[in-house]
């Protein structure tokens, strides 16, 4: 159900009037990821094969105070021919508390949709005013968003029993099992997704690899990218790009959605490994690395890095002409009251691919 309540979000502060009060919406126990949920052990105890033990999340349990840490600096990028002109600057267009702001995608009116993990909702942001409307609530710790060429909207849900939820044209669970068992049985963490034009969805589960849910929601698994994180299709949907640690890998995509020919596409140069990705109208690939957006040609040639704020873990094209690159930024102590997030934006020469939201 869509909410007509509007969150008035100040550009550099946390202030809102929403269906969820900040005291509850950003409480660490409000919307848990599966690995944080005390009920996880009961679910995995019923798996036919126990999933691998999950390592502790770096930074979890630190920075116990709730005081906001200093916001990361906004570096000034150099020019990259055809991509970004010299003299452009990042600006903050949204900021709030918690482990929020993930999976950004463009809307046709120039706004940005994004998911809030801790708050468990999906919001629509007008970057010009900082006003954000809650579109969907109760998302079971929603993360990545994707809209197919046909207009269907999907969300990667990271809570216990999560997987792929369809939000539009009707809201329903699309896929959350593999070979008859919950996705918790494969191990890892649901991370990102991309929807194709045939009605299926590719899902990256960090620690488990790449999965494809066909139009009926039946899932197949593809090995070779155990650290799968960001995931995006090429313009013609014949290539699937997946960030896998310090590299980007690619698969050939077949008419039935199956994947073959896993190969290394490019090595990342900046930051802490690859995360969310986007493509532009010329087929270039942009990958968030934790401190930059690394840019590659369609052939896999490294074209340069657009340095961004420390903690930038996802990118998307948006704006009325789709020539603005938006970045999502996390800083502070992960899983603690000091956690903070931002959405930042910078104008580019390049234009995002118009045939899909991302």
Q: Where in this protein do the model-derived segments appear?
A:
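Sec-dependent signal peptide recognition
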Residues: 2-8
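C-terminal, active-site-flanking charged/polar segments
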Residues: 17
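Sequence-structural signature of mature extracellular/luminal beta-sheet repeat domains
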Residues: 20-358
């Amino acid at each position: 159900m869509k909410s007509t309540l509007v969150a008035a979000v100040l550009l550099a502060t946390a202030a809102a009037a929403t269906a969820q009060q900040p005291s509850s919406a950003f409480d660490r126990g409000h919307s848990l990821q599966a690995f944080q949920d005390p009920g996880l052990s009961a679910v995995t105890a019923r798996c036919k094969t126990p999933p691998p033990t999950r390592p502790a999340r770096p930074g979890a349990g630190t920075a116990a105070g709730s005081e906001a840490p200093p916001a990361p600096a906004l570096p000034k990028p150099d020019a990259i021919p055809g991509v970004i002109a010299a003299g452009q600057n990042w600006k903050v267009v949204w900021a709030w508390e918690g482990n929020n702001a993930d999976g950004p995608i463009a809307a046709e009116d120039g706004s940005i949709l994004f998911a809030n993990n801790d708050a468990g909702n999906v919001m629509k942001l007008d970057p010009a005013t900082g006003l954000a409307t809650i579109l969907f609530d109760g998302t079971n710790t929603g993360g990545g968003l994707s809209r197919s060429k046909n207009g269907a909207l999907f969300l990667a849900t990271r809570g216990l029993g999560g997987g792929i939820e369809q939000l539009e044209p009707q809201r329903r669970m699309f896929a959350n099992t593999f070979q008859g068992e919950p996705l918790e049985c494969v191990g890892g963490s649901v991370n990102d997704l991309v929807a194709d034009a045939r009605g299926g969805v590719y899902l990256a589960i960090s620690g488990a690899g790449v999965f494809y849910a066909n139009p009926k929601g039946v899932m197949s698994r593809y090995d070779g990218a155990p650290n799968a994180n960001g995931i995006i299709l090429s313009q013609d949907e014949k290539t699937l790009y997946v960030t896998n640690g310090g590299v980007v890998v690619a698969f050939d995509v077949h008419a039935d959605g199956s994947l073959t020919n896993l190969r290394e596409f490019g090595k990342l140069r900046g930051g802490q490994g690859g995360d969310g990705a986007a493509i532009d109208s010329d087929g270039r690939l942009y990958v968030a690395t934790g401190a930059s957006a690394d840019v590659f040609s369609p052939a896999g040639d490294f074209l340069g890095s657009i340095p961004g704020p420390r903690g930038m873990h996802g990118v998307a094209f948006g704006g009325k002409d789709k020539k603005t690159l938006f970045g999502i930024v996390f800083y502070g102590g992960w899983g603690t009251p000091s956690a903070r997030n931002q959405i930042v934006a910078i104008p580019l020469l390049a234009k995002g691919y118009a045939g899909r939201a991302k």
